[in-house]
Amino acid sequence: MAALLASQSCCYGGETARVTKAIGFSSSLENHFTGEATQCYGSKSKRFRIEMRQSELPSKVGINGRSVKMVPASEVVKRKDGVNGSAGKGVNGASLVSSRNINGAASTLVKAPKKTTESYLPPPVEGVRVLPSDEGFSWADENYSSLQRSIDVWSFVISLRIRILFDNSKWAYVGGFTEEKQKSRRRETASWLRESVLQLGPTFIKLGQLSSTRSDLFPREFVDELSKLQDRVPAFSPEKAKRFIEAELGAPISVMYKEFEEQPIAAASLGQVHRAVLHNGEKVVVKVQRPGLKKLFDIDLRNLKLIAEYFQKSESFGTNDWVGIYEECALILYQEIDYINEAKNADRFRRDFRNINWVRVPLVYWDYSAMKVLTLEYVPGVKINNLDALAARGFNRSRIASRAIEAYLIQILKTGFFHADPHPGNLAIDVDESIIYYDFGMMGEIKTFTRKRLLDLFYSVYEKDAKKVMQNLIDLEALQPTGDLSSVRRSVQFFLDNLLSQSPDQQQTLAAIGEDLFAISQDQPFRFPSTFTFVIRAFSTLEGIGYILDPEFSFVKVAAPYAQELLDLKQRQRSGTQLVQEIRKQADDARSSTLSMPYRVQRIEEFVKELDSGDLKLRVRVLESERAARKATILQMATMYTVLGGTLLNIGVTFSNQGSQLVANGSFIGAGIFMLLVLRSMQRVNKLDKFEKMI
Ligand SMILES: Nc1ncnc2c1ncn2[C@@H]1O[C@H](COP(=O)(O)OP(=O)(O)OP(=O)(O)O)[C@@H](O)[C@H]1O
C-alpha cells in the first residue's frame, strides 16, 4: 500500500508523474499494487497509474523497529476492484473510493478512512485551548498585496522610530524630565511594540522572540516585553492544514494517515501541530507550516533589509553591525521554515543522545515529511514547568532540574550541537522521568576550534587572568581589537575579581551574570556572536526552570563535575609538551626584551632631545570642547528650524482660513520639513550625549 501512495501520479506538484517503482512511505513495506485512474487535487485533472504489490509477510519491522501491521496480499488483490471507481473496501485501515475532487469536477480516487467509531488517537491532550481562527488578519491571507504589506511594515517602523525618539528626548517630557518618567514611557512603548508585533504576524513575532535574547542590542524594557511573546498566533483552519499537507506530501490525508486530529495540539507563529495515526498504528504528530510563509518572509525581509541598511548608515543607532544582524536573523528565519533541516537536526540530536536513556528525542518519519510538513513520533509528556502535573505523577523535581542542566552541558561541552531555544514549551517530562525535547528548528553548533577557544577562555577565567581573557575573546571574535583596550581590561578584571569570587551564598544567578556581561558590553567594543547569546540565554532559561522546580537548585553544583573534568584535562595537557613549550616561550620573551632594552632607552632619549630643540611639536586637541561646540551648533540650528517651522505653520493656518489652500499646503509641507530637521538635530544631540557617557 505504501507503494500505492507514493507512486500516485497527482496534481499537487503541478505536473503529471508516473511512478511505478516501490518508493515510499516505509521501505519496510513491499506492497506493489497496480491500477489506473484519474487523479486531481487542483484545477487540472490527470491520468495516473498505480501499482501495488505486497509480500506475503503478515507483518514486518517498520520504522523505529516496531512491527507494521499489513494486510495479506490476497486481501489486497480482492480490494483492487475498488480502484476502478466503485466504492472500495478498506486497505490497511482505509478504503479506496471514487469521489469528486475539491472543485467538484472530475472523478477522483481518494482513500477514505475506514468507517469505524473507534479512535486510534490517544486521549485528548489536557490543557489544549480552542485556538482562535486566523481569519481577519491580513497576513493570514495568502494573496495579500505586497504593497499593502510594505506600507504596514514601514508604518510600524516609522511609528516605532518616532516613539523611541520622544522617549529619549529630554525636551519631550512635559513638566520636566525624570528617569522614572522615561522608564514608564519606555515600558509603554515596549508594550505597544509587543502588540504591534503580534498584529504584524509570523515574521515579526519570530524576530521579536529572537530580539528578546539580545539584551546587548535592545533596551531592557523591550527585551522584557518581547520575551513575553509566547507564540499567541491564531491557528489556521483544519481544512487549510489538510489541503496544505496533501499538496506538500502529494497524497490525500486519508491515504497517509489512518486518523488525523483536526484540532491542533499547538499553534505557533510558523506552524501548528496536529496529532495523527499512521496506517501501521504508529502515533505521530504532524507539524504543518503556515501556508504562504515563504512569500510573507520574502516581502518582510526585503523591507527589513532596507531598514537594517538605514540603521547601519544612521549615526543614532550606534556602531552595531545592523546588516550583519539582519543577515543572521534572515538565515535563522529561512532555516526555521525548512522542515527538512529541522528533521535533520532532530535526527542528529537524537543520535547525540542515543546512549543517554534519560533524554528522549522524537523519531522523524522521513517518508511523511517534506519542506513544510514534518511528521514525528508522538512523544507526549508533562511540560517541565507544569509543577502540579509533575507533583501528581510523583516526579523528583530536583533530579529533573539537574538533568535539564546536565543535558545542556553535554550539548555545549561534548557534542557541540545544542538546542538554541530550550524554553519550557519545548521541554517535557516522560512517564519514566526522562526529558523530552521538542522543536529542532533553531539549533546552534559550536565547531571544534570554537570549542577549543571557549575552553581556553574558561581556563583564563578560572586563572583570573584579564589579559588572557581578552586575548581569548579577541580570538573568539567577541571583542574587536581596535583602539585603546585598557578600559575593557579594567572591566574584565572587575568582572573576574568581583563577580566570580563570590562565596556560594553570595553567588549570583547566571541570568544576573549574563545581564552584567551585556551591561559591560554596551560601553565596550564587544560583539557577542549570536551563538553566545543563545547559549547564555539558554542557560539562564534553564537556570530559571531549575529554581522553579527546586528552590534549593544550584547551577554550580550541577556544573562542578564538568568544570573539574575540564580542569583535569587541562592539567594533564600541561604536564606534557605544553609545559616544555611554555618554558621555551618564557625564555624567548626574556631574551628578546633583554636585547631590545638598550635600543628602547636610546629612542626615548632621541624624543626628549627633539622636544628640547623644538624639532618635535605636540598638537593637543581638546575633544570634549570640540564636542561641546558641535552640540551647541546643532542646538542653534534646531532652534532656528523650530522657529521657521512654527512660522510656516502659522502662515499655513492663516492661508487655510482665508481659503488659499494651495499656499497653505505649501506652508504645511515646509513646516513638516523643518520639524523633521528638528527631530534629526535632536537625534544627533542624543548621539553625542550617549557617546560622551561611553568615554
Ligand atoms: N513529537 C511530539 N510529540 C508530542 N507533542 C509534540 C511533539 N512535537 C511537538 N509537540 C507539541 O507541539 C508543541 C509545538 O511544537 P514545536 O515547538 O515543535 O512547534 P513550533 O511551531 O516550532 O513552536 P515554537 O516555535 O513555539 O517552539 C510542543 O510544545 C509540544 O507540546
Curated annotation (Swiss-Prot):
- Catalyses which reaction? L-seryl-[protein] + ATP = O-phospho-L-seryl-[protein] + ADP + H(+); L-threonyl-[protein] + ATP = O-phospho-L-threonyl-[protein] + ADP + H(+)
Query: What Enzyme Commission number(s) apply to this enzyme?
Result: 2.7.11.1
Determine if rRNA-binding is one of this entry's keywords. no
Membrane-spanning intervals of the chain? 633-653, 659-679
User: Mind telling me which InterPro entries this protein's record contains?
Assistant: ABC1_dom, Kinase-like_dom_sf, UbiB_kinase
- Which residues does the entry assign to the active site, renumbered to this chain? 421 (proton acceptor)
Summarize what gene deletion causes: Larger plastoglobules associated with thylakoids characterized by VTE1 accumulation and high tocopherol content. The pale green double mutant atsia1 atosa1 accumulates ferritin and superoxides, exhibits an increased nonphotochemical quenching (NPQ), and have a reduced tolerance to reactive oxygen species (ROS). Lower levels of the highly unsaturated lipid digalactosyldiacylglycerol (DGDG) and of different forms of monogalactosyldiacylglycerol (MGDG) and kaempferol. The abc1k7 abc1k8 double mutant accumulates strong levels of oxylipin-conjugated MGDG and DGDG.
Q: Where in the cell is it found?
A: Plastid, Chloroplast thylakoid membrane; Plastid, Chloroplast, Plastoglobule
Q: What induces it?
A: Down-regulated in response to iron deprivation.
| Any single biological process term in GO | membrane lipid biosynthetic process
Provide any one GO MF term from the record: protein serine/threonine kinase activity
Which positions does UniProt annotate for ATP binding? 265-273, 287
- Topology of this chain in the membrane: Multi-pass membrane protein
* Domain called Protein kinase: residue spans: 259-589
EC main class here is transferase
Tissue localization of expression: Mostly expressed in leaves and flowers, and, to a lower extent, in roots.
Please provide an example of a Pfam family that matches this protein in its UniProt record: ABC1
Q: Please provide, in alphabetical order, the Gene Ontology terms of the cellular component aspect for this entry.
A: chloroplast thylakoid membrane; plastoglobule
Q: Which coarse location class applies to the principal site listed for this UniProt protein?
A: plastid
User: What protein family is recorded?
Assistant: Belongs to the protein kinase superfamily. ADCK protein kinase family.
What the protein does?
Involved in resistance to oxidative stress. Influences responses to reactive oxygen species (ROS) production. Regulates plastoglobules formation in thylakoids. Together with OSA1, regulates iron distribution within the chloroplast and mediates the oxidative stress response. Together with ABC1K8, influences chloroplast lipid synthesis/accumulation and modulates chloroplast membrane composition in response to stress.
Q: What is this protein called?
A: Protein ACTIVITY OF BC1 COMPLEX KINASE 7, chloroplastic
To which species is this protein native?
Answer: Arabidopsis thaliana (Mouse-ear cress)
